[in-house]
Amino acid sequence: MKFMKRDFCAIMRLGQYFIGYSDNPQNHEAVRDLVYSFKPFVPEDQIESVLNIANLLDFETSAAAVSQLGEEEYRWAIDVLHKAATAEGEMNSEQQEMWDRLMEIYWDYQEPDDKGQYDAWS
């Protein structure tokens, strides 16, 4: 699958759907906290870069962050988080639930509905 810029915007916004899709700053913190929960499973030499990207998990700034960092860095960060999230026997139940729900929403986003719209954008 080839990722497009809008895919990265969508991925960065998925956390908002997971916790209620809100402009509430506490929700933004909750999204970042969930990403930080993966820190123990991210290779040590990659933690700083991943956490810097995690800090950009904000509904208002995600599109700007994509432009600022570029698609390659986002692709890398998502790949690292995915590998961390899918490490065998490593995730606790909260992390597993978060990852499962994010992936469910992500794949819903990939499939247009009968009107040609993507679920995660509705």
Where do the language-model regions lie?
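Small-residue-enriched hydrophobic alpha-helices in membranes
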Residues: 1-122
